[in-house]
C-alpha cells in the first residue's frame, strides 16, 4: 500500500467512525483506538504535505480565523414557516390545501421543531463546499469553516448522492453541553449564557474555528433541495439523506391523515422533556414533492408546510422568600424560594432572579403569585407577577446592601449588573469557593481532595487560603469527620503532587476574576512568570493579544492586593510552578523580536505548527490575519488568493520557507 493509499484508507475509516459515533450514536471502536488512528493520519499528513486535504478528519479541530463573515446569496431562498397554536388552525390549513389541490389523498411528514440556528449546507460531488446561515432568507453569512468542526456534519458523503444539492437543518446545543459550558463560566466568575439557542447561534459567528470545535454543537438535518433529486417525496428524501451520512432525526414520522398528525403532536407535547435538546413545536409538511411544487409559496412561507407551536412551559406559584448566594468571586446572586410546583417534568422549588435590575424590572415581591418558566427548558426563571393576587400589604423588595454571609457592605461597579462582596479574604463562601476552584481538575487537579473536604478543612481552622493546603499534615487531617489514614495520606500526597502542575494551570487556579483557561495561557505565554504579570500595568496588559480592559483591570487589582502577594510568596516558597519551565520556555534567540508573521499555505520543510513555534522561539509573533502591522507572510503552496492580494496591497514582504530559514541563520 502506498503512502497516499494509507492516508486515504485512514480518512475513510475515521469518517466512518465519526458517522457511527456522532450520527448513529453507535460507536464501533474505543475512543483510544480512534485517537491512535487519528494520530497516525496526522503524522502521515505532516510528513507528506502534498496530500493535504481540507476535508480530512484531521481538520475537524479548526484553527481558521475569520475576521469578517462574507455575505453569500442562497441558491434557494430560506423561507420562514407560518405558525399555528391550535388543532383548529391545522384543520384550517388542511382545508386551504385541499381547496387548492382538489380532492387528492394527502400524507404528511411530522418533524420536531428544533430551537437552534438554521443553516443551509451545499454539497458538490459528495463534498461540503459551503455553509450559510439563514440571514434574511435571501442571503446569509458564510460560516463554512465553523460548520466543518461539528462532527455530526459530514465533510464527505457516501453512496449514490446527487452531483449538487443543498441540505437544510438546525445547529443545536444539547442541554448537557449547555450546562457544562455555563458551569465553566460560573467557575471563573463570568455571566452564564442565557439559553442553548442563542449560544448555538453565537457559536457560528466566533472568529476562531478552533473555539467552535471545543463547543459541543450538534446538527440535525431535515430538508433537501436541488434539481433532479432522486426521490419523489419528502420522507423518501430523508431516508436517502441518512444513507448518504447525514444525521436525520429519527423522530420524523409519516402520517396518513390529520388525526395521525394530532397523535404525533400529543405524544411529543408530553414527552419533549425526554429529549436531549430544545424543541418548541412540530413542523407538518405535505409529503409529496409534486404537490409541494403545485402549492408553491406565499411572500414569506411555503403553503405546503406549517409549524405547530407547543404552549410555553409556564406555571404560577407563590414566592415565599428571596435568599442571596455568594460566589467565589464575591458575586451576589438573588434566588427565589418558591412554593414547590411541577414544571416540565420536574419539581421546581427555586428560580434565579439574576440581579437587582431584574427584580426591579418585574417588581417582584415576597408573597407574590409569580409566573415561572423554564428558560431553554432547563433553568427556571420568573417571567412575571399576577398583580391581581398581590396582597394589599405588599412591600417593594429592597435589595440587600450588605453581604448575607459576612455583613460587609456590598459594592456595584459602574457598567456591571451584579453586586459584589469586597471582603475577599474574610467571607466564608468566597474563601471556600476559591480553594475549591484552586483544586479543580482544570486548575491544580488535586486528587484526594473534594469540595466538601475543603469546607471541612476551613470550618476546622486548618485552611484560610490555598497556600495553607501545603502546610497540611496527616496528623491534622485524621481527626476530621469521615477521614481515615489512607484518605488523609492520599490528600496530603495529592497536594504535594500539584507542585508539578504547569504555570498556566497555576495562573488559572488563582481565581483572578475573568481569567479563564484561555486567558491564563495567553498571559503565561506572554509574560513567562508571575512576577512579570504582577509588575505589568494596565496599558501593558491590554496590549497582550485578546486581553481587554475588563480583564486587565481585574489582573491589576488582584496583584495590588497585599494579601494576594503574601499568598503568592508562600506558594513560591512551597515550590509551586510560578514560571514557565525551561523545557517549555524554548526561546532560542531574539532575531525576530518585534516582527509579526502570518503563515499561509502548505510547506515542504516545516509543518505550519513548526513554523509558528520557530517564529515564537526566536522572539517573533504569529498573526492570524494580514494587516498593516504584518512584517512578513510566509507563503507555501496553495496560499489563498485573497491573502496574497491583501499582502500585495499592503506591501507586506512575502517570503518562502527557505527565506525564513535564512532569516534565522543570518
UniProtKB/Swiss-Prot annotation:
User: Could you say which residues bind Zn(2+) here?
Assistant: 403, 406, 421, 427
By its UniProt entry, which SMART domains does this protein fall under? BRCT (SM00292), LIGANc (SM00532)
Q: What class of enzyme is it?
A: ligase
Presence of the UniProt keyword 4Fe-4S in the record: no
- EC number, as in UniProt: 6.5.1.2
Q: Which parts of the sequence bind NAD(+)?
A: 31-35, 80-81, 111, 134, 170, 285, 309
Q: Which cofactor does it need?
A: Mg(2+); Mn(2+)
Q: Which InterPro entries match?
A: BRCT_dom, BRCT_dom_sf, DisA/LigA_HHH, DNA_ligase, DNA_ligase_CS, DNAligase_adenylation, DNAligase_N, NA-bd_OB-fold
**What sequence ranges are listed for the domain BRCT?**
587-666
A biological process from GO? DNA replication
Q: Show the GO cellular component annotation of the record.
A: cytosol
Keyword vocabulary terms for this entry: DNA damage, DNA repair, DNA replication, Ligase, Magnesium, Manganese, Metal-binding, NAD, Zinc
Summarize the protein's role: DNA ligase that catalyzes the formation of phosphodiester linkages between 5'-phosphoryl and 3'-hydroxyl groups in double-stranded DNA using NAD as a coenzyme and as the energy source for the reaction. It is essential for DNA replication and repair of damaged DNA.
Please report which protein family the annotation says this sequence is part of. Belongs to the NAD-dependent DNA ligase family. LigA subfamily.
- Report the protein name in the record: DNA ligase
Amino acid at each position: 500500500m502506498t503512502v497516499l493509499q494509507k492516508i486515504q484508507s485512514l480518512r475513510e475509516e475515521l469518517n466512518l467512525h465519526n458517522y457511527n459515533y456522532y450520527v448513529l450514536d453507535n460507536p464501533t471502536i474505543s475512543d483510544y483506538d480512534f485517537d491512535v488512528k487519528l494520530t497516525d493520519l496526522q503524522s502521515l499528513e505532516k510528513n507528506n504535505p502534498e496530500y493535504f486535504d481540507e476535508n480530512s478528519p484531521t481538520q475537524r479541530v479548526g484553527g481558521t480565523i475569520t475576521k469578517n463573515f462574507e455575505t453569500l446569496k442562497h441558491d434557494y431562498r430560506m423561507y420562514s414557516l407560518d405558525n399555528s397554536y391550535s388543532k383548529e388552525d391545522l384543520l384550517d390549513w388542511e382545508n386551504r390545501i385541499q381547496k387548492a389541490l382538489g380532492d387528492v389523498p394527502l400524507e404528511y411528514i411530522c418533524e420536531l421543531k428544533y430551537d437552534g440556528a438554521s443553516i443551509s449546507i451545499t454539497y458538490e460531488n459528495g463534498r461540503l463546499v459551503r455553509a450559510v446561515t439563514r440571514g434574511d432568507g435571501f442571503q446569509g453569512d458564510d460560516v463554512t469553516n465553523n460548520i466543518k468542526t461539528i462532527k455530526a456534519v459530514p465533510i464527505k458523503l457516501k453512496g449514490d448522492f446527487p452531483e449538487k444539492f443543498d441540505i437544510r437543518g438546525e445547529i443545536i446545543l444539547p442541554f448537557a453541553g449547555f450546562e457544562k459550558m455555563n458551569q465553566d463560566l460560573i467557575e471563573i466568575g463570568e455571566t452564564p449564557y442565557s439559553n442553548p439557542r442563542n449560544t448555538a447561534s453565537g457559536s457560528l459567528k466566533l472568529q476562531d474555528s478552533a473555539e467552535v470545535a471545543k463547543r459541543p454543537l450538534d446538527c440535525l438535518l431535515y430538508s433537501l433541495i436541488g434539481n433532479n433529486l432522486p426521490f419523489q417525496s419528502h420522507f423518501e428524501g430523508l431516508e436517502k439523506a441518512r444513507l448518504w451520512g447525514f444525521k436525520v432525526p429519527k423522530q420524523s414520522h409519516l402520517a396518513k391523515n390529520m388525526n395521525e398528525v394530532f397523535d404525533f403532536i400529543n405524544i411529543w407535547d408530553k414527552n419533549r422533556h425526554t429529549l436531549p435538546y430544545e424543541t418548541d413545536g412540530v413542523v407538518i409538511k405535505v409529503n409529496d414533492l409534486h404537490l409541494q411544487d403545485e402549492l408553491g409559496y406565499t411572500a414569506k412561507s411555503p403553503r405546503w408546510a406549517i409549524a405547530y407551536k407547543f404552549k410555553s412551559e409556564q406555571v404560577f406559584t407563590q414566592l415565599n422568600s428571596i435568599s442571596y448566594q455568594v460566589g467565589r468571586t464575591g458575586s451576589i446572586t438573588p434566588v427565589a424560594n418558591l412554593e414547590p410546583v411541577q414544571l416540565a417534568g420536574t419539581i421546581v422549588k427555586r428560580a434565579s432572579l439574576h440581579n437587582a435590575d431584574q427584580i426591579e424590572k418585574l417588581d417582584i415581591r415576597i408573597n407574590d403569585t409569580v409566573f415561572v418558566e423554564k428558560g431553554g427548558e432547563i433553568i427556571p426563571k420568573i417571567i412575571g407577577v399576577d398583580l391581581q393576587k398581590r396582597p394589599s400589604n405588599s412591600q417593594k423588595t429592597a435589595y440587600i446592601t450588605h453581604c448575607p454571609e459576612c455583613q460587609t457592605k456590598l459594592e456595584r461597579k459602574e457598567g456591571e449588573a451584579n453586586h459584589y462582596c469586597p471582603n475577599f479574604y474574610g467571607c466564608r463562601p468566597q474563601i471556600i469557593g476559591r480553594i475549591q476552584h484552586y483544586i479543580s481538575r482544570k486548575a491544580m487537579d488535586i486528587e484526594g481532595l473534594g469540595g466538601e473536604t475543603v469546607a471541612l478543612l476551613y470550618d476546622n481552622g486548618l485552611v484560610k487560603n490555598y497556600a495553607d493546603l501545603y502546610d497540611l499534615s496527616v496528623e491534622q487531617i485524621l481527626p476530621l469527620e469521615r477521614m481515615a489514614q489512607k484518605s488523609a495520606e492520599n490528600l496530603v500526597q495529592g497536594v504535594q503532587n500539584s507542585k508539578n502542575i504547569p504555570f498556566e494551570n497555576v495562573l488559572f487556579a488563582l481565581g483572578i476574576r475573568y481569567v479563564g483557561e484561555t486567558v491564563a495561557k495567553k498571559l503565561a505565554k506572554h509574560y513567562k512568570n508571575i512576577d512579570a504579570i504582577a509588575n505589568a500595568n494596565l496599558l501593558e496588559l491590554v496590549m497582550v493579544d485578546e486581553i481587554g480592559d475588563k480583564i486587565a483591570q481585574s489582573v491589576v487589582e488582584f496583584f495590588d492586593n497585599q494579601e494576594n502577594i503574601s499568598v503568592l510568596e508562600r506558594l513560591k516558597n512551597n515550590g509551586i510552578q510560578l514560571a514557565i519551565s525551561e523545557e517549555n520556555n524554548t526561546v532560542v534567540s531574539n532575531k525576530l523580536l518585534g516582527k509579526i508573521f502570518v503563515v499561509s499555505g502548505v510547506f515542504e520543510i516545516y509543518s505550519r505548527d513548526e513554523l509558528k513555534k520557530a517564529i515564537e522561539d526566536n522572539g517573533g509573533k504569529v498573526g492570524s490575519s494580514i494587516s498593516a502591522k504584518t512584517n512578513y507572510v510566509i507563503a507555501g503552496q496553495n496560499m489563498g488568493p485573497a491573502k496574497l492580494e491583501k499582502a500585495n496591497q499592503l506591501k507586506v514582504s512575502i517570503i518562502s520557507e527557505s527565506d525564513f530559514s535564512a532569516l534565522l541563520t543570518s
